[in-house]
């Protein structure tokens, strides 16, 4: 029996559901949500996903799609989820140097000296090796686009604190060359297309 998987449609609880051998989705994470299956204070991002995504069969002990990395509860923006372990590892490993762009709103004015320090590298309290921004572009006097290729705990907030400023709002707008679509509302999700996945490939 031959099946055309590309055009296969399933019905889950009466709702038509396209077949995907592996799930790759993006979520516009809203503020006040946790990237955890067992949240401690705020609602879980997984409650924003439909049951078929949360309960997809998986070889690991945990069912369903998993977040590729994490965003703090107050951070908004582009979040990837998948049930492909190799994809999750490739996208979250610091060795792969996948660029991630954050729109940062600061409490104090951003000056050229602060930008220079972020680009040159700052030392965080848990690592003597300086961490630096791959790019830092001032949008206005209290807003900048910061590009990182690694993901330490609270990294953006700690980097801004290290140069004498403070993060007031944080939004991830891009991973690789994949941008968060302007029409994807907070709390909504969509399947990644083949073109989207190519935009997540490492930059040569």
Write out the residue ranges for each language-model feature.
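Basic, flexible Lys/Arg- and Gly-enriched helix-loop patches that mediate nucleic-acid binding at interfaces
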Residues: 1-204
